[in-house]
Amino acid sequence: MGILGAIWGLTGVSLLLGSAIYRLTPLAIDAFSHNFSWYHWAFLFIVLFFMAYAEGYRGFQKGFSPRVAARALYIKNNPRLLHALLGPFFCMGFFHATRRRKITSISVTFGIIILIILVRFLAQPWRGIIDAGVVVGLGWGLVSLIIFSYQAFTQKKFRYSPEVPEENTTK
């Protein structure tokens, strides 16, 4: 049950990221069907760089991806039916997590939902430019999740915390 829950958790999170990339890529490409002025190109460059750094590197590579992999490894090593059944939600830190992790996971999710709603009101090419940045960040995130997941399940010691409540009781 543990390994199946871990696989389900990682697959579910990967599908969530992949689905967003799949849905946003055509909108990003559509932006290029419009005539770009110099300021569109400048904004595109800034957005791509910012999203690669802030979302891809800082958000995913330094935080989300290693934590998701660590939580999937936790399911494998500490199998519980609810954790396995709700693997993607467990891996994203929505339950059986430290209080800080749950608050952060829920807050970030709501923030993303609000940003998605707001960006939908933008006209092209602005929406496509922002979506291009999001695709870059999500792509970076998906690749980093695959790499960290591989490391978590092949290394003897994975150095990232799953941020589960039991860790706080030993300190």
Predicted features along the sequence, with ranges:
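Long, highly hydrophobic alpha-helical transmembrane signal-anchor segments
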Residues: 1-52, 110, 114, 120-138
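Membrane-embedded alpha-helical bundles that constitute the cytochrome b-like, heme-associated redox core
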Residues: 7, 52, 59, 91-98, ...
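Hydrophobic alpha-helical membrane-embedded segments
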Residues: 32-70, 144-148
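Surface-exposed extracytoplasmic segments
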Residues: 138, 143-144
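Cytosolic/matrix-facing juxtamembrane and C-terminal tails of multi-pass cellular membrane proteins
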Residues: 146-171
